[in-house]
Amino acid sequence: MSKQVAHSFSSEDFSFIKQKLAREAVALVEPGMRVGLGSGSTAREFILALGERVRNERLAITAVASSRISHLLAQALGIPFLDPALSQELDLVVDGADEVDANLRMIKGGGGALFREKILLQSGKRNIILVDERKLVSVLGTFPLPIEISPFGCSSVEKVLNQQGYIGDWRKTSHGERFITDNGNYIYDVSSPDSYPHPEEDLIRLLQIRGIIDVGFVIAKAEVWVGYADGTVVRKEIT
């Protein structure tokens, strides 16, 4: 099923789409499940919806969050947690993405939690990525590619990246300081190249550079649920 992407959105449209996606995804959660909680605005809506079910239905589940922000929100809603060091497998992981191409390859990490998000996806028996139609692209690269880098030797890592043609900037906070991930690392946002027709090749190349912790490409089996401004949700999966 294919749809045309809408060209005009309001903030109300965005909120409605995210809430609808979250409600449909949270309906899949069953008692006893171990649930992976992603990061970002769409994942936030899922956490809110899950917290409502936990409160209203006394739904007995446990969770692992991919970021401190998601953890604190879920904790405030009364969602119980697993020890992330001991959770080998999750029944369901729900997250968002910054871009998704026609082959369901993605760029993630706009919120700076890409390393932990990818660990949860690796652990998930079923992975669902929730996006609105704006996130669909023909080729990845419109959104800057986040790379998580160790502070130790970060300048030399940047030099190697630049030599290989990956040009960008260190992510900064609103106060102008370097953004630090929950793992204590930096994020380097690559803006050039601005097109990745073969992200698998770039991923392999980048992970060979010492000092790079992880890269924002996600090339993994996942369902992608796309919400449209007319209220429909299309579920995509590469089989």
UniProtKB/Swiss-Prot annotation:
The active site is at E117. GO terms for cellular component: cytosol. Substrate binds at S39, G40, S41, T42, D95, G96, A97, D98, K108, G109, G110, G111, K135. GO terms for biological process: D-ribose metabolic process; pentose-phosphate shunt, non-oxidative branch. CDD domains: RPI_A. Pathway: Carbohydrate degradation; pentose phosphate pathway; D-ribose 5-phosphate from D-ribulose 5-phosphate (non-oxidative stage): step 1/1. The keyword ATP-binding does not apply. Pfam families: Rib_5-P_isom_A. Its EC number is 5.3.1.6. It comes from the Bacteria. One of its GO terms (molecular function) is ribose-5-phosphate isomerase activity. It is an enzyme of class 5 (isomerase). Keywords: Isomerase. It catalyses: aldehydo-D-ribose 5-phosphate = D-ribulose 5-phosphate. InterPro entries: NagB/RpiA_transferase-like, Ribose5P_isomerase_typA_subgr, Ribose5P_isomerase_type_A. Catalyzes the reversible conversion of ribose-5-phosphate to ribulose 5-phosphate. Homodimer. This is Ribose-5-phosphate isomerase A. It comes from Chlamydia muridarum (strain MoPn / Nigg).
